[in-house]
C-alpha cells in the first residue's frame, strides 16, 4: 500500500520595503488561492489560529507599533467556533514600520 501527501500552500507571500531615511515600512503581500482564506490578526480566544508575525532582533533596528492590515477583514459568524470571525480572501497587505538608527550601515541582502 502506498501513501502520498502533498504540502498545500494556499497563501503565497512577497515582502517589500519602502521609505526613506530612518523610518521604513515592511510590507507583507499575501496572495490567497480561491477557496481559501487567511484569518485576521485579532481572532478571539477559543477561535482558530490568527495570522501572526514574529521578528528577530536586529541591532540598531526597532519596531514601531504593531503589524497593521491594509483593509478590514470580512466578518462572519462561524457556527464551528460559535463566534464572529474575521478573514481575508484573495489578497491582503500587512505593514510593519521600523526605525533604523543608522541607515547608512543598514543593508538588506
Where are these regions (language model features)?
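Extracellular/lumen-exposed scaffold segments
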Residues: 3-109
Amino acid at each position: 500500500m502506498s501513501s502520498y501527501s502533498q504540502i498545500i500552500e494556499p497563501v503565497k507571500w512577497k515582502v517589500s520595503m519602502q521609505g526613506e531615511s530612518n523610518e521604513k515600512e515592511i510590507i507583507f503581500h499575501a496572495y490567497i488561492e480561491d477557496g481559501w482564506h487567511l484569518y485576521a490578526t485579532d481572532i478571539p480566544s477559543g477561535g482558530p489560529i490568527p495570522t501572526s508575525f514574529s521578528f528577530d532582533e536586529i541591532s540598531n533596528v526597532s519596531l514601531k507599533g504593531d503589524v497593521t492590515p491594509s483593509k478590514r477583514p470580512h466578518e462572519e459568524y462561524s457556527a464551528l467556533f460559535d463566534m464572529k470571525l474575521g478573514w481575508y480572501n484573495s489578497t491582503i497587505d500587512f505593514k510593519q514600520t521600523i526605525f533604523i538608527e543608522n541607515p547608512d550601515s543598514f543593508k538588506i541582502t
